Regions:
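Short, conserved SAM-binding/catalytic segment
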Residues: 148-154
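Core catalytic lobe of class I
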Residues: 1-146
């Protein structure tokens, strides 16, 4: 999964499609504080879901060429996510519910989750709270230390 503001979404689609199979682009309603745009208020960001093969995990069920069972995709499983509220008391950049929804769709408890651009640890906090193991990398030392503290305290 790659989270992206709309300005960079096309670039990520091009990069991902060179090495991965893009399964879907999720558009979610980003209810962050008002932007400084002089035109339309932007409330949408993209999440790119790509896999290395056509065989992957979705909603705790395998999907792919050698699977018999097809996962039940209900009305709630749309690629338009408008149901994730922004909690103003959270310390992170993204709502925790966003990561929780992704983790529940694509992993089991005790699975490892890798975030090579962990920032201040939003994905690590969600992993810890949902029973996943986490590995994160960050080049900014201040962000790394803040992220480690947030994950430890969650």
């Amino acid at each position: 999964y790659i989270l992206s503001p709309w300005q960079y979404s096309g670039m990520y689609q091009g990069l991902l499609s060179n090495m991965f199979l893009i399964q879907t682009r999720i558009t979610w309603r980003d209810q962050s504080p008002a932007s400084q745009d002089k035109t339309w208020k932007n409330e949408a960001s993209d999440i790119w879901f790509a896999t290395k093969t056509d065989e992957f995990l979705f909603k705790q069920h395998p999907v792919g060429v050698n699977t018999i069972e097809v996962p039940d995709v209900s009305e709630n499983d749309s690629n338009l996510w408008i149901d994730i509220p922004k909690n103003l008391d959270e310390e992170g950049h993204y709502p925790r519910g966003l990561f929780t929804k992704i983790l529940e769709a694509s992993s089991f408890k005790l699975n490892w989750v890798l975030d090579p651009f962990m920032g201040i640890g939003d994905s690590g906090v969600a992993c810890k709270q949902s029973g996943r193991r986490f590995i994160g990398f960050e080049t900014n030392k201040d962000h790394l230390l803040l992220g480690m503290k947030r994950i430890d305290n969650s």
